[in-house]
Structures are given as structure tokens and as C-alpha cells.
């Protein structure tokens, strides 16, 4: 991971109007039809932003997202229109602000976001495994009996979520509920495109020694109503990546993401008690930051080289 640049916890561009700060990205308006997305080095876990950044994380997430947009969009498999404009982020900020955006930003079309998180699961893991143990289904999708933790599913399943307000948890919903929200045509297209992207990406990643257990996509509509893939795509922040060589059904594989931080937060004590997963977050030790950075870097190195 490139740590030669100082870590960027929060971008401070004054030449463009700030639209929003998400858990990781800061979005700025560029005219009325474009957005500059700056991926900071912030880390969130349990929907709480940590005070300590992960040096190089924003650049890594951007590089990986651009890799996937290239593979899956019009230049590659052409599975779906994408939100990239092709314009250089550096071209819309002042010279003094260039270091804040270089390598960690995307200049994208301003879309109307759809209120559905398009989640695709190819393996049983995390909250899906917990739900399956309880009722034999995941988000209303009935699954065969006898599956174990980390089992590969017979076919990838689509388990959408409703986007929550900032700071809240996304809510798992059924496909039928997405139809009520956005109509049958859009709901069906999002489902079918999401599964197609997941299958294609899984093959590409598997050849590089990475299993994509699950992932989430976001879509929006452009001025012409064209369904467009947006935000980040297939990064360790939006996906569960496992090393293929250590995969074993029945156990939690190590993952190339912030699981290391999550595990540390699960056992850390604050004033003699377990942290209650509300702000402020406990201070993350340098060792945990370094190991988390190494996990992200390993995923990128495997995928891109």
C-alpha cells in the first residue's frame, strides 16, 4: 500500500461545493451534472467511523474500483453502463488541492441514486449464516438444508437491502419489496445485472486466488433514465474477499478487509466494559492499523499485481 503520501482522514476542498461526507467518501459538486468522489483513508466498522485513518486505503479502493469498472463496463464485458466520465479529477480542482485528489478520486456522472442496495451472495457467511441457522433462509430466500458456515450456494442469490439514512444500518428487504419501491422493470433489471456482474467478477477473481463471498452494488439513473452502475464496486469495503487457498467449508476464512479491526473491536474494553459500538470509537492501535492496511494491500496485489 502506498504510504508515501500522508493519510487523508478528511478532504478539505474549498474550490468545489461539498455535497456530502459518507463513511469513506467525500462528494463534491462539479457543475450540475458531475460529482468528484474523493475516497479518504477513513475506516468505519459497525457503522462508526474510526478516528485513525488507514494510510493509502482511499487510493487502493479507487484503484480497485477502476479495475472492475474497466473489466465490467463498456471497455470490457459491457454488462452495464457505468458512472465514470473519463475526465481527470485533477482538472476540476485548484493546483494546491491536487494532492488531496490524485490517485484517490473519480469524476463521475451525477445520477439519481436508487434506494436499493443490490446485495449478491455466492457463499453463506456473516449475517446470512446466522439467519440461515435460525430459519433456513437468507432475506426470504429459502436455501437447501445441511449447509455450513462458508458453504458455497448452489447459485448466487440476490438479497437486497433498503438504503438507510446516514449512521443507520441498511435494512434487509425482499425482492418483492424492491418492486414496490422502484417498480417491476427496474427491480428485475437491477437483480439480473447484479447477479451477472457477480458471476463474471467471481470468475476473474477466482483465477487470481480470491473468492468473492458476497458483495453489494449501487445503481442510479442518468438524465435519460439509463440504469447505471455507480459508487464503488467490488472493493474490500463493499465485498467479502477470501483467499482461495485457505478456504474450507465450515469455518470462517480470513478475509481481505476490515475484519481484523472488527475482531479487535469485539474484544476491546472501554472503561472496563466491552465497547458498545456507538461513537466515539476507541483508539485503534498502530499494530491493528498496519495489519488492516496489509490485508487491503494483499487483495489489490493479488487482483492487479
Curated annotation (Swiss-Prot):
Listed pathway(s): Purine metabolism; IMP biosynthesis via de novo pathway; 5-amino-1-(5-phospho-D-ribosyl)imidazole-4-carboxamide from 5-amino-1-(5-phospho-D-ribosyl)imidazole-4-carboxylate: step 1/2
Annotated HAMAP family: SAICAR_synth
Keyword check for Ribonucleoprotein: no
Keywords assigned: ATP-binding, Ligase, Nucleotide-binding, Purine biosynthesis
GO cellular component: cytoplasm
InterPro entries the UniProt entry points to: SAICAR_synt/ADE2_N (IPR028923), SAICAR_synth (IPR001636), SAICAR_synthetase_CS (IPR018236)
Record EC number: 6.3.2.6
Keyword match Chaperone: no
Protein name: Phosphoribosylaminoimidazole-succinocarboxamide synthase
Family recorded in the similarity comment: Belongs to the SAICAR synthetase family.
UniProt catalytic activity: 5-amino-1-(5-phospho-D-ribosyl)imidazole-4-carboxylate + L-aspartate + ATP = (2S)-2-[5-amino-1-(5-phospho-beta-D-ribosyl)imidazole-4-carboxamido]succinate + ADP + phosphate + 2 H(+)
One Pfam family from the record: SAICAR_synt
Signal peptide range in chain numbering: none
Highest taxon of the lineage: Bacteria
Record GO biological process: 'de novo' IMP biosynthetic process
Gene3D superfamilies: ATP-grasp fold, B domain, Phosphorylase Kinase, domain 1
GO MF: ATP binding; phosphoribosylaminoimidazolesuccinocarboxamide synthase activity
Amino acid at each position: 500500500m502506498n504510504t508515501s503520501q500522508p493519510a487523508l482522514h478528511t478532504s478539505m476542498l474549498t474550490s468545489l461545493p461539498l455535497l456530502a461526507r459518507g463513511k469513506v467518501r467525500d462528494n463534491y459538486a462539479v457543475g450540475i451534472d458531475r460529482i468528484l468522489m474523493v475516497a479518504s483513508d477513513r475506516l468505519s466498522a459497525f457503522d462508526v467511523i474510526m478516528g485513525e485513518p488507514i494510510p493509502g486505503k482511499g487510493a487502493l479502493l479507487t484503484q480497485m474500483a477502476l479495475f472492475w469498472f474497466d473489466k465490467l463496463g463498456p471497455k470490457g464485458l459491457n454488462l452495464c453502463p457505468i458512472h465514470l466520465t473519463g475526465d481527470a479529477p485533477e482538472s476540476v480542482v485548484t493546483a494546491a488541492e491536487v494532492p488531496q485528489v490524485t490517485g484517490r478520486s473519480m469524476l463521475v456522472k451525477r445520477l439519481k441514486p436508487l434506494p436499493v442496495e443490490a446485495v449478491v451472495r455466492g457463499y453463506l457467511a456473516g449475517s446470512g449464516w446466522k439467519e440461515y441457522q435460525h430459519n433456513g433462509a437468507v432475506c426470504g430466500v429459502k436455501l437447501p438444508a445441511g449447509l455450513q458456515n462458508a458453504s458455497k450456494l448452489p447459485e448466487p442469490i440476490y438479497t437486497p437491502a433498503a438504503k438507510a439514512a446516514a449512521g443507520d444500518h441498511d435494512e434487509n428487504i425482499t425482492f418483492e419489496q424492491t418492486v414496490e419501491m422502484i417498480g417491476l422493470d427496474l427491480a428485475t433489471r437491477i437483480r439480473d445485472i447484479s447477479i451477472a456482474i457477480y458471476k463474471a467478477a467471481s470468475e476473474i477473481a477466482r483465477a487470481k486466488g480470491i473468492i468473492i463471498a458476497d458483495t453489494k452494488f449501487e445503481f442510479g439513473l442518468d438524465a435519460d433514465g439509463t440504469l447505471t452502475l455507480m459508487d464503488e464496486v467490488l472493493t474490500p469495503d463493499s465485498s467479502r474477499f477470501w483467499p482461495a487457498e485457505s478456504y474450507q467449508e465450515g469455518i470462517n476464512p480470513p478475509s481481505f478487509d476490515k475484519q481484523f479491526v472488527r475482531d479487535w473491536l469485539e474484544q476491546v474494553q472501554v472503561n472496563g466494559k466491552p465497547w458498545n459500538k456507538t461513537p466515539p470509537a476507541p483508539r485503534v492501535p498502530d499494530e491493528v492499523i498496519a495489519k488492516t492496511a496489509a490485508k487491503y494491500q494483499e487483495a489489490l496485489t493479488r487482483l492487479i499485481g
